[in-house]
């Protein structure tokens, strides 16, 4: 884990309220951005993820691009490759969690 990531994790571990705020902000990011962040947290390059997915590296770059609207199946497949899940959460559940 790099210096900033380590420092952020230590802060989030020490301050649960900050961890919740961080999670809420992360959830508001576009899915391609979340995917790119998680790929980097898993220490995978786009090339390494492409190899896992058996696609060319530019396909991963397009999936992660803010200017591209990837298919949900591509997002789900890439998310599983970085050990993540894509969830649909009802607004009322999100509101309940926000007040926790």
Go through each PLM region and give its residues.
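Positions that flank functional sites
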Residues: 54, 93-94
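Recognition helix of helix-turn-helix/homeodomain-like DNA-binding domains
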Residues: 53-69
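The DNA-recognition helices of helix-turn-helix-type DNA-binding domains
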Residues: 66-67, 82, 93
């Amino acid at each position: 884990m790099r210096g900033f990531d380590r420092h952020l994790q230590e802060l989030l571990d020490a301050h649960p309220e900050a961890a919740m705020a961080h999670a809420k902000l992360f959830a508001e990011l576009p899915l391609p951005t979340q995917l790119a962040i998680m790929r980097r947290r898993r220490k995978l390059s786009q090339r390494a993820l492409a190899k896992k997915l058996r696609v060319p590296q530019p396909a991963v770059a397009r999936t992660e691009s803010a200017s591209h609207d990837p298919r949900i199946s591509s997002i789900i497949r890439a998310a599983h490759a970085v050990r993540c899940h894509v969830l649909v959460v009802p607004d009322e559940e999100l509101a309940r969690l926000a007040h926790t």
